[in-house]
Regions:
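Short glycine/proline- and aromatic-enriched beta-strand/turn motifs that initiate or cap beta-hairpins
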Residues: 20-68, 167-169, 195
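Outer-membrane beta-barrel channels and translocator barrels
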Residues: 26, 69-71, 114, 158-160, ...
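Residues that define the transmembrane beta-barrel architecture of outer-membrane proteins
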Residues: 27-31, 52-60, 99-103, 143-149, ...
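Residues on the lipid-exposed face of transmembrane beta-strands in outer-membrane beta-barrel proteins
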Residues: 33-39, 60-68, 80-82, 105-111, ...
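Structural signature of outer-membrane beta-barrel domains
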Residues: 38-42, 83-87, 126-130, 167-171, ...
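Outer-membrane beta-barrel translocator domains and adjoining extracellular loop/strand segments
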Residues: 43-50, 88-95, 131-138, 174-179
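Repeated loop/turn-to-beta-strand initiation elements of outer-membrane beta-barrel proteins
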Residues: 73-76, 117-119, 159-164
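Predominantly the C-terminal beta-signal and adjacent terminal strand-loop region
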Residues: 138-198
């Protein structure tokens, strides 16, 4: 009985090991243009007025990402993205829209747990392009640099890649802040890309 269990366990481990690989050989380089939607949200500490609600700001995410396949289960990716971030804040009869547009540089490790599927995490460096509160310029009030931790999952099929990730902002957006007001610009993004082998 013990032998049967051991053989079964070895078979499961072997199958899992074979499944835990990328779709490409070690040492391969790929380039992936991508486009999709971003859903910006205000996180951190924010003094809420009575009846106030934080809302999502929807925008565009587009860019390009290169990936190096280091092992059968690990890819290292670096990219450059344009992202429309920010948020909406609603109180009765009034909506304020914070429009923050960034160039983001993500550095991500892709862990290929099964063929085609990758879990990912890393770091992201954001550089502010424009900032508006409704239609008023707000750039002088905003930090020029944003640091975030992206976490996500992707699936590749016939070179097409669907990527969903959440960028947890670490650094605050507002220059003038205190213990009760430390605004952070989170971003959930869903993109479709196509991988070219170099």
């Amino acid at each position: 009985m013990k032998k049967i269990i051991m053989i079964a366990l070895m078979a499961i481990v072997t199958c899992t090991a074979e499944a835990q690989n990328t779709l490409r050989e070690n040492g391969t380089l790929t380039l992936q243009p991508k486009i999709g939607a971003g859903f910006g949200y205000l996180s951190g500490k924010f003094e809420m007025e009575p009846g106030g609600q934080r809302r999502i700001r929807t925008g565009i995410v587009l860019g390009v990402e290169g990936e190096y396949y280091a092992t059968e289960w690990l890819g290292i990716a670096a990219g450059v993205n344009y992202a429309m971030q920010g948020w909406k804040y609603e109180i009765p009869n009034v909506t304020t829209v914070m429009k923050l547009n960034y160039i983001n540089i993500p550095l991500v490790a892709n862990f290929y747990v099964v063929k085609g599927f990758a879990l990912k995490t890393g770091v992201q460096f954001g550089f502010l392009l424009t900032a508006k509160q409704n239609e008023d310029d707000w750039k002088s009030n905003a930090e020029k640099f944003n640091f975030a931790i992206p976490v996500g999952i992707s699936y590749e099929f016939n070179n097409f890649v669907i990527d969903a990730r959440y960028n947890f902002a670490v650094s605050p957006v507002n220059k003038v802040r205190n213990d009760d007001n430390r605004w952070r610009s989170d971003l959930m993004q869903l993109t479709l890309g196509y991988k070219f082998t170099l």
